[in-house]
């Protein structure tokens, strides 16, 4: 069976692993998932990202991050633009997540970037997801 929304699958896997406090998780690789994983790492939501090449499409290995007393760093993930209802925003309409405490992942002509970076570069695009 084919997967209709691989990004939602990625976010669901991260959410589920985070809820049961797994140290790492693996998911099928794609270019957009790699970009999303790198943003999550650079923004401090996950510890590390590894790419494992195999004969097929490869695997992304995410190492989740937890604070003191094993508290979750990622408190929420929400898919915004879905295959059945795409959500786009112009450069001046890119939303802030929780007044700047979270990030919005924006797919632009310059690749996948955060909402802050999109405002700084003055570009709009498809709002992929919110992370907080």
Curated annotation (Swiss-Prot):
One of its GO terms (biological process) is translation. One of its GO terms (cellular component) is ribonucleoprotein complex. PROSITE patterns: RIBOSOMAL_S8. One of the primary rRNA binding proteins, it binds directly to 16S rRNA central domain where it helps coordinate assembly of the platform of the 30S subunit. Keywords: Ribonucleoprotein, Ribosomal protein, RNA-binding, rRNA-binding. The gene is rpsH. This is Small ribosomal subunit protein uS8. GO terms for molecular function: rRNA binding; structural constituent of ribosome. It holds the Pfam family Ribosomal_S8. The lineage of its organism: Bacteria, Bacillati, Bacillota, Bacilli, Bacillales. Part of the 30S ribosomal subunit. Contacts proteins S5 and S12. PANTHER family: 40S RIBOSOMAL PROTEIN S15A. InterPro entries: Ribosomal_uS8 (IPR000630), Ribosomal_uS8_CS (IPR047863), Ribosomal_uS8_sf (IPR035987). Belongs to the universal ribosomal protein uS8 family.
């Amino acid at each position: 069976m084919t997967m209709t929304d691989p990004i939602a699958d990625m976010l669901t896997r991260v959410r589920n692993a985070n809820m049961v406090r797994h140290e790492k998780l693996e998911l099928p690789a794609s270019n957009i998932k790699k970009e999303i994983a790198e943003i999550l790492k650079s923004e401090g939501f996950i510890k590390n990202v590894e790419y494992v090449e195999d004969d097929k499409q490869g695997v992304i290995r995410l190492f989740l991050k937890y604070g003191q007393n094993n508290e979750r760093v990622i408190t929420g993930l929400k898919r915004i633009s879905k295959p059945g209802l795409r959500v786009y925003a112009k450069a001046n309409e890119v939303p802030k997540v929780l007044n700047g405490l979270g990030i919005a992942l924006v797919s632009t002509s310059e690749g996948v970037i955060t909402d802050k970076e999109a405002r700084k570069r003055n570009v709009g695009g498809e709002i992929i997801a919110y992370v907080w």
